[in-house]
Amino acid sequence: TIDIELQKQLDKPQAWFCKYFPARIRNVSEREIADRKLVFDFKDGRAYEEVAQRTAANMTERYGTSCTNIVFSPVPASTDKKNEIRYKAFCQRVCELTGAINGYDHVSVSGERLTIHENRKAEKEVRKVNVIEFDSAFFNGRAVVVFDDVITKGLSYATYANQLESLGANVLGGIFLARTHYKVK
């Protein structure tokens, strides 16, 4: 079961631009192969212009001129280096295109710590997770749109949105490059 606070975040508006089929899913079309490549390229910092254009178009369509009062903030990647490669130029470009306030510099990944996760077979598994530091004063009282590259169940997005709201922000919803799918229709 999903925590009530996380569900509250998942109930907010979400947009995603393509389907992502994990590499182990083989019988996918050329379109899905191209989408998978776009996801990988974006994660490696290469396809940010195309994704920034789509993201900006979605924000402008949904929020119009009020984009100038919205903070754009991505769910941080697993390390500070990956976060910079994936999001620094991307966030700057989305904010140039929309007039939104760039939240990139107000969140940082400062290291890793161990956590225990229960997996599908109910076995306990120890994983490293990133420690995220926030510029609390910056987010207090702000409307925020959260971005993440891929949404599967939405727990990373919902957890991050909750963290922002605990600082006094109002998360409006999430935008995602892709949504994970496992069955090819």
Language-model segments: residues:
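Hydrophobic alpha-helical packing residues
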Residues: 94, 98, 164-165
